[in-house]
């Protein structure tokens, strides 16, 4: 495990729940808090049945995957993965010059509101699937959380609260996520 206080690798069952939220067929995907690319790897390997339940297929294996990661140790890990392109090092400073069909992430819980606001700002057309500390949604006591609550309401965002999501994770915590 890396020595990083904000790095909580996303458990596979939680990644699967996130993937199940995807409604479209993205071709370009960004994980702006990529860590070791667990979400991207799971998306590439994710398989599902066709609508007639006759055969299994992998709908996201040919997507173009981009990542942003601030931790230099994690950047070194990402650099060794040929299926992901590390395009920047700090999502909150990222210019948004690229266009993506999907932004999917588990950002640091202490900056989740700022990360999701940035994702909303740079998403021109497509979907956003984000994992946040539930308190970020339930307790909008800061300016950025209030702005996030307003912008989510304007977009009729679908929010699901998941208790004990990190109970059996590589790095455990009892935080509820949304």
Protein language model regions, located:
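Class I S-adenosyl-L-methionine-dependent methyltransferase catalytic core
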Residues: 1-178
